[in-house]
């Protein structure tokens, strides 16, 4: 049986708060600075990924579902040497999606930019990206109607995100099985 973390309805407002700096209208200089300052640059979401690509900046890891606001197809092209496909239903983080984010970050640390193509919904995959990425990485994601958030990965941010994750449905089962599957809530990709 696959362990799935499910977002409870009561946590949705908390996820609307930015975990980093909110950029209502990022400039090309902002995109370049974020790229230069990051250990690993991870984008979650089609609009965010497309915005970096339009500035000729390829994220180290891009997580997309090829839709913007659930409707418009987005094609990141063939700009990524590695593409990983995964299913992740809306409002969830599956074990497979978590492991795929980890693999994508591992590829990026080895020098291979990776596109993670999600069937379903990618929105919540910023959570494993933050928990897995090495410190000083930057995870960028969109906040609908607000702009783009750039979250610099620190131990403090990882601790905050983990506290939120413990409130997801299925967390206790996931935590109890994580040693079997080789994943842990605060796992760090190889450096």
Curated annotation (Swiss-Prot):
GO molecular function: GTP binding; kinase activity
Recorded catalytic activity of this chain's protein: 3'-dephospho-CoA + GTP = GDP + CoA + H(+)
One BP term from GO: coenzyme A biosynthetic process
EC identifiers of the protein: 2.7.1.237
Class of enzymatic activity (EC top level): transferase
InterPro entries: GTP-dep_dephospho-CoA_kin (IPR007164)
Pfam families on file: DUF359
Keywords assigned by UniProt, alphabetized: Coenzyme A biosynthesis, GTP-binding, Kinase, Nucleotide-binding, Transferase
Sequence positions that bind GTP: 46, 65, 67, 122
Annotated metabolic or biological route of this protein: Cofactor biosynthesis; coenzyme A biosynthesis
Functional description taken from the UniProt entry: Catalyzes the GTP-dependent phosphorylation of the 3'-hydroxyl group of dephosphocoenzyme A to form coenzyme A (CoA).
Family per similarity comment: Belongs to the GTP-dependent DPCK family.
Entry protein name: GTP-dependent dephospho-CoA kinase
Lineage: Archaea, Methanobacteriati, Methanobacteriota, Methanomada group, Methanopyri
């Amino acid at each position: 049986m696959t362990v799935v973390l499910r977002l409870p309805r009561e946590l949705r407002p908390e996820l609307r708060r930015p975990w980093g700096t909110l950029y209502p209208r990022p400039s090309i200089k902002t995109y370049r600075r974020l790229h230069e300052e990051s250990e690993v640059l991870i984008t979650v979401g089609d609009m965010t990924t497309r915005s970096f690509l339009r500035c000729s900046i390829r994220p180290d890891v891009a997580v997309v579902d090829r839709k913007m606001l659930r409707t418009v197809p987005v094609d990141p092209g063939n700009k990524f040497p590695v593409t990983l496909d995964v299913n992740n239903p809306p409002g969830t983080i599956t074990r497979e999606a978590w492991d795929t984010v980890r693999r994508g970050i591992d590829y990026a640390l080895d020098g291979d930019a990776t596109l993670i193509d999600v069937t379903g919904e990618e929105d919540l995959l910023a959570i494993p990206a933050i928990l897995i990425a090495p410190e000083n990485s930057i995870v960028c994601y969109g906040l609908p109607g607000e702009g783009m958030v750039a979250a610099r990965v620190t131990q403090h941010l990882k601790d905050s995100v983990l506290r939120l994750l413990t409130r997801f449905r299925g967390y206790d089962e996931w935590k109890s099985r994580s040693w079997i599957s080789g994943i842990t809530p605060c796992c760090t990709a190889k450096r």
